[in-house]
UniProtKB/Swiss-Prot annotation:
<dbReference type="GO" id="GO:0016743">
    <property type="term" value="F:carboxyl- or carbamoyltransferase activity"/>
</dbReference>
<feature type="binding site">
    <location>
        <position position="141"/>
    </location>
    <ligand>
        <name>S-adenosyl-L-methionine</name>
    </ligand>
</feature>
<dbReference type="GO" id="GO:0002098">
    <property type="term" value="P:tRNA wobble uridine modification"/>
</dbReference>
<comment type="function">
    <text>Catalyzes the conversion of S-adenosyl-L-methionine (SAM) to carboxy-S-adenosyl-L-methionine (Cx-SAM).</text>
</comment>
<dbReference type="Pfam" id="PF13649">
    <property type="entry name" value="Methyltransf_25"/>
</dbReference>
<protein>
    <recommendedName>
        <fullName>Carboxy-S-adenosyl-L-methionine synthase</fullName>
        <ecNumber>2.1.3.-</ecNumber>
    </recommendedName>
</protein>
<feature type="binding site">
    <location>
        <begin position="98"/>
        <end position="99"/>
    </location>
    <ligand>
        <name>S-adenosyl-L-methionine</name>
    </ligand>
</feature>
<feature type="binding site">
    <location>
        <position position="49"/>
    </location>
    <ligand>
        <name>S-adenosyl-L-methionine</name>
    </ligand>
</feature>
<dbReference type="InterPro" id="IPR029063">
    <property type="entry name" value="SAM-dependent_MTases_sf"/>
</dbReference>
<keyword id="KW-0808">Transferase</keyword>
<dbReference type="InterPro" id="IPR041698">
    <property type="entry name" value="Methyltransf_25"/>
</dbReference>
<keyword id="KW-0949">S-adenosyl-L-methionine</keyword>
<dbReference type="InterPro" id="IPR005271">
    <property type="entry name" value="CmoA"/>
</dbReference>
<feature type="binding site">
    <location>
        <begin position="74"/>
        <end position="76"/>
    </location>
    <ligand>
        <name>S-adenosyl-L-methionine</name>
    </ligand>
</feature>
<comment type="similarity">
    <text>Belongs to the class I-like SAM-binding methyltransferase superfamily. Cx-SAM synthase family.</text>
</comment>
<dbReference type="GO" id="GO:1904047">
    <property type="term" value="F:S-adenosyl-L-methionine binding"/>
</dbReference>
Length: 253
C-alpha cells in the first residue's frame, strides 16, 4: 500500500506585491526583493505548483538509490528539498543548486530541521558549472527555461551523464503552443488563473514585460526532443495545465 504523503509545503507567508507597488525588476531577476516574496509568487503564478512539488517527492522516493545524491537544480528557497527531507525515511545526500545567494539563505533556514536527518549541500553556482556525478535523481522545476538554447542542451546532457543507471530526471517547464490560436486561448486562461489568485491586470502585464527575452519557452515537442537527444530512453509527461508541464525522463544504462 502506498504511504500517504503530507503535502503541506513550508512556504513564506509574505505576499507578492512586487509588480503592484514596485520597484519591479526589469528585466526580471531573482534579486533580494523577488526572493522575499518568491514562495507566494510561485504558488499564485504556477498552476498545480503544490501537486508538482509533491509529485517530484513521490518520484524521487521511487527512484532514489542509497549512497547516491539527490540534486535539485534551481532549488530556490528549498521547498522541494524540505518536503522530501520530511518524507524520505533513510538519511540521504540532498543537494540544492541555485545561482542566487539570497535564495540559498532562505533555503538554509527552511532546511534547518531536515539537516538533522540528511546531509544537506547548498551550492551557489550556475547549474552548467556543476557536476551531477553519482546522482540517482535530479529535479529541475522551472529552471531550464531561463537558459539559452545551447546551454539547455548542454546541461541536459551533463545531467544524463551524471545520473547512475536507473536514474531519473524530474523536470517542469513553461511551454508554448505551435498553434497561434491555441496559444492565445492558453494565455487567456492562464491570465485568468493569475487574476483569480489576486493579481491585477497591471501586475500581470508588468511581469510579462519583465520576463520578455528572459524566460523563453519551447513547445512540448521541442522539450521532448531535447530530452531524447540528451540520451534519455523513456520520457513521460505527468502533469500539465495551461502552459506548464512536468516530465520524467529515465536513464536505462
Amino acid at each position: 500500500m502506498t504511504e500517504p504523503l503530507e503535502t503541506e509545503l513550508y512556504l513564506s507567508s509574505e505576499k507578492d506585491e512586487l509588480f503592484e507597488k514596485g520597484p519591479w525588476p526589469k528585466p526580471f531577476a531573482f534579486n533580494a526583493e523577488v526572493v522575499k516574496v518568491f514562495d507566494n509568487m510561485v504558488c499564485r503564478s504556477v498552476p498545480l505548483y503544490r501537486e508538482v512539488v509533491a509529485g517530484a517527492v513521490h518520484w524521487t522516493r521511487a527512484y532514489y538509490q542509497p549512497k547516491t545524491r539527490i540534486i535539485d537544480i534551481g532549488c530556490s528557497t528549498g521547498t522541494f528539498l524540505e518536503l522530501l527531507g520530511r518524507f524520505l525515511k533513510q538519511p540521504a545526500i540532498l543537494v540544492g543548486i541555485d545561482n542566487s545567494s539570497d535564495m540559498l539563505d532562505k533555503a538554509k533556514e527552511k532546511l534547518a530541521q531536515v539537516e538533522q536527518i540528511h546531509q544537506i549541500e547548498l551550492i551557489c553556482e550556475s547549474a552548467e558549472n556543476c557536476s551531477f556525478e553519482k546522482s540517482s535523481v535530479v529535479v529541475m522545476n522551472y529552471t531550464l527555461q531561463f537558459l539559452s538554447l545551447p546551454q539547455r542542451q548542454k546541461l541536459l546532457r551533463a545531467i544524463y551523464q551524471g545520473l547512475v543507471p536507473g536514474g531519473l530526471l524530474f523536470i517542469s517547464e513553461k511551454i508554448r503552443s505551435d498553434c497561434p490560436q491555441f496559444q492565445e486561448t492558453i494565455t487567456h486562461h492562464y491570465e485568468a488563473f493569475k487574476a483569480k489568485n489576486g493579481y491585477a491586470q497591471n501586475e500581470i502585464e508588468r511581469k510579462k514585460e519583465a520576463l520578455e527575452n528572459v524566460l523563453i519557452p519551447l513547445s512540448e515537442a521541442e522539450q521532448l526532443q531535447m530530452l531524447k537527444q540528451s540520451g534519455f530512453s523513456y520520457i513521460e509527461s505527468l502533469i500539465k495545465l495551461h502552459n506548464f508541464v512536468s516530465f520524467v525522463a529515465f536513464k536505462s544504462d
